Amino acid sequence: MFDATTILGYKADGKAVIGGDGQVTFGDTVLKSNATKIRTLYEGKILAGFAGSTADAFNLFDMFEGILAEKRGDLFKSVIGFSKMWRKDKHLRQLEAMMIVLNTEHIFILSGTGDVVEPQDGKIAAIGSGGNYAISAARALDKHANLEPRELVQESLEVAGDLCIYTNKNIKILEL
């Protein structure tokens, strides 16, 4: 289901950064190498990225943007409201997508089952087929290197691109 991408979110030093590769695959075929899987939400104050079904992800983005507007951009309240809505609707629970949403204060993973996970370290999250490679690289770089947040995301996604066949190095990055 998620064999199509790598998305990495990172927040540190008062900054929030999200990045994703550009590869879209269907089975064993690369359909597109320059897709955009990250975007800003709520007047550019929230970053979001998705892995999984593109159609499902765009539905999730739209629904989440509606809740963000309702909660006036409060990310914490929005993810809780989103999860409650998701759990009540059996059709939403069938969506095959995951999202990372973050700002300079919070970072969350929203799963296709309506779960909301705040990473244990509170600053690094990754999803998609190359997510484990990207998060491993990001944790090591966060601990041992003195990189700017944007550089850390770039380098970590490049590691994932080297190792995951469903991830390429056509990386796009957004920053707050």
Swiss-Prot record:
One of its GO terms (biological process) is proteolysis involved in protein catabolic process. Na(+) binds at residues 161, 164, 167. Allosterically activated by HslU binding. It is found in: Cytoplasm. It comes from the Bacteria. It holds the Pfam family Proteasome. The active site is at residue 5. Keywords: Allosteric enzyme, Cytoplasm, Hydrolase, Metal-binding, Protease, Sodium, Threonine protease. GO terms for cellular component: HslUV protease complex; proteasome core complex. GO terms for molecular function: metal ion binding; threonine-type endopeptidase activity. It catalyses: ATP-dependent cleavage of peptide bonds with broad specificity. Transmembrane segments: none annotated. It is an enzyme of class 3 (hydrolase). Belongs to the peptidase T1B family. HslV subfamily. A double ring-shaped homohexamer of HslV is capped on each side by a ring-shaped HslU homohexamer. The assembly of the HslU/HslV complex is dependent on binding of ATP. Protease subunit of a proteasome-like degradation complex believed to be a general protein degrading machinery. NCBIfam families: ATP_dep_HslV, PRK05456.1. This is ATP-dependent protease subunit HslV. It comes from Sulfurovum sp. (strain NBC37-1). The gene is hslV.
